[in-house]
Design a protein with these regions (language model features):
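Flexible, polar/acidic helix-loop-strand segments at domain edges
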Residues: 339-410, 432, 451-452
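Conserved, well-structured interaction surfaces
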Residues: 57, 92-163, 184-195, 202-214, ...
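Long, intrinsically disordered, low-complexity segments
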Residues: 31, 291, 295, 302-307, ...
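Surface-exposed intrinsically disordered loops and tails
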Residues: 190-193, 207-215, 259-280, 345-363, ...
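Sec-dependent bacterial lipoprotein signal peptides
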Residues: 2-29
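Aromatic-residue-lined binding/catalytic grooves and analogous aromatic/hydrophobic interfacial grooves
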Residues: 32-34, 165-169, 194, 198-210, ...
Length: 580
């Protein structure tokens, strides 16, 4: 899909006042100029009020235009700092420094002003849109107002995850003085950011998203962030797990627009010959899976194009020299899974359970979970000549595309719903999402009555919408076969009975959480989630090693740089980019 956002708002005087450019010229010792406006780049009317339908449409498109600039960093900052991706020898120095958490110098991926450009656009829109205007009994601009609030909250969450503590600015900055004063205020941490925007968004959760039809070649419904899912994320980061589970549940089970669990999977074609697979797994191309994305341009002339294909894949533009590749850690996580078959036995009422071999396969990526094989391919075209300017290896990561950067998709929301349920005290229900799928019939079979009673309608699914049938399966089955029958993939149990039920729940919660985080790696690899997933649990447990250990070992146990990197990452202050 090719997306073109260069709509004619570029020609309309007065509508680009919200495309307000900001830049950074700060050092570690001084940050007074971080938000200084570059007023020469825009033409605006300071007292202009947004009171025409075209104002709101073009202004929202302008905000998306600014979001395009930070879109690649959603993936890069989440993966290059994580353990599933590592830079190659061909990588640019900025990627190598990012991977090593070496932030002493300038880095093209550390441009905080780009985030504040989005935020200032949002702040201006929210301050000037006429939310009282009605026509024929319908509020004209409330949908855009709510959508822009979501853009702002999401952007601030990205800031907090990447920088740790940042200035929290909720009003538009129109002068250099205002920008300098904003920089002198106390900085807000992740929890403060989340609490602020939980309160900011909640009153508007019932407002429908704007309906613009097609914008270029994009269906505009995918351009807007689902507010309930975003509130779930904010509550999850804030440690408000019951509320997070509520928001995720209500989003997924909306009777007017329910979000079903994935029906896509990749499987071995049969259980006797392991030389062919059946693959319907295309999560970033399926309209049933995609919830929200940032569209990218197809030509530099039109605006911002994604550089991810040239960083992750072999292309003619990079002479096939990819700069980022799958790590040894990613391969190990995938290979550690056990692929299960459940076969019918002729004339019998029971089924036969088999497991895929772990050696002798035609490709090493086929060991364990098959999602890795589905997404990653590395092919050799012979040895490289000393005189050739082209790489003899070709890498293709199918999840990486130029058309859009996906920021919400259904399976990842289900996994965060599982994470919230588990931390809220419902590990059986959370585990059901991984192993069986989730609907009322499954929950009644797989979750004990005590937990079902305690969880109440947090795990209630309308049987008319979420109906159990033979195609229902848990998320782990997307790449690991018939997980419902897998005897090696089970709910953790203590070796001896514990004194109380609550003791057992407390024992299970961190272990189920580990399984969820592993599943997030298998399902969400190369999409930008990994570092933040590790960080969220490390902060929750007050255990920096939860992040430091896997990230430092991304290249394998024998990596000579692992010890120094682990020592650096044991201090959470080193996880974040500096504000310069």
């Amino acid at each position: 899909m090719r997306t073109k956002i260069n709509i004619e708002y570029r020609r309309l005087k007065g509508l680009f006042f919200i495309l307000y450019s900001l830049f950074i010229s700060m050092t570690l010792a001084s940050c007074a100029d971080m938000l200084e406006p570059e007023s020469d780049l825009v033409e605006f009317e300071e007292d202009h009020t947004l009171n025409h339908a075209t104002d709101s449409v073009y202004s929202v498109m302008g905000i998306i235009n600014k979001m395009q600039i930070i879109a690649d960093r959603v993936v890069l900052l989440g993966e290059v700092r994580g353990d599933l991706v590592q830079p190659t020898s061909a990588a640019n120095s900025d990627l190598k420094h990012l991977s090593a958490f070496d932030f002493d110098g300038d880095n093209r991926y550390n441009q905080i002003s780009d985030y504040y450009a989005v935020i200032n656009n949002c702040n201006y829109f929210l301050a000037h849109i006429d939310t009282a205007m009605e026509r024929r009994g319908r509020n004209l601009f409330m949908r855009e107002y709510a959508a822009v609030k979501s853009y702002r909250a999401w952007t601030y969450l990205q800031l907090a995850l990447n920088y740790g503590e940042v200035p929290l600015i909720l009003n538009p900055l129109m002068t250099e003085r205002e920008a300098r004063e904003a920089m002198n205020q106390p900085r807000a941490d992740i929890k403060t950011i989340c609490e602020t925007f939980i309160n900011d968004l909640t009153p508007y959760v019932g407002v429908n998203l704007p309906e613009y039809g097609n914008v270029g070649n994009s269906n505009s419904e995918y351009l807007f962030i689902p507010m309930r899912a975003l509130l779930g994320d904010l509550c999850l980061w804030a440690g408000r797990y019951q509320e997070a589970a509520r928001w995720y549940h209500d989003f997924l089970t909306d009777k007017y627009d329910p979000v079903m669990m994935s029906r896509q999977k990749i499987t071995w074609a049969n259980s006797t010959q392991f030389n062919a697979i059946y693959n319907s797994y295309t999560p970033l191309k399926s309209t049933s899976e995609i919830l929200c994305y940032i569209p990218m341009e197809s030509r530099v002339f039109d605006g911002t194009i994604s550089q991810l294909p040239n960083l992750f894949n072999s292309t003619t533009e990079n002479n096939y020299f990819y700069e980022l590749t799958s790590s040894a850690s990613m391969a190990k996580i995938s290979a550690d899974q056990i692929y299960c078959f459940e076969n019918d036995i002729p004339g019998a009422t029971t089924k036969d359970t088999l497991y895929a071999p772990r050696t002798g396969l035609i490709r090493s990526e086929l060991t364990g979970d098959l999602r890795y094989y589905s997404n990653y391919d590395l092919t050799s075209y012979g040895s490289k000549s000393d005189y050739s300017e082209y790489n003899s290896y070709r890498q293709q990561i199918d999840k990486i595309g130029a058309e859009r950067i996906i920021i919400y998709r259904s399976t990842m929301v289900y996994l965060r719903y599982a994470e919230a349920l588990n931390r809220a005290g419902y590990p059986q229900s959370a585990f059901a999402i991984l192993k069986y799928g989730i609907c009322d019939d499954i929950l009644k079979q797989r979750v004990d009555p005590v937990e079902l009673s305690l969880a109440g309608d947090l795990v209630s699914f309308d049987p008319e919408l979420f109906r159990f049938d033979g195609s229902y399966f848990g998320i782990h089955s997307i790449g690991s076969g018939d997980s419902h029958a897998n005897q090696y993939y089970t709910l953790p149990q203590p070796t001896e009975a514990l004194p109380t039920r609550q003791d057992t729940v407390a024992y299970q919660i961190p272990l189920v959480e580990d399984m969820i985080i592993t599943e997030m790696a298998l399902e969400g690899a190369f999409e930008g989630y990994r570092f933040n997933d590790l960080m969220r649990v490390a902060l929750r447990r007050n255990d920096p090693a939860y992040l430091a250990d896997p990230v430092s070992r991304r290249k394998g146990e024998a990596d000579p740089e692992a010890t120094g990197l682990r020592q650096k990452l044991m201090d959470p202050k080193n996880w974040y980019l500096p504000l310069h």
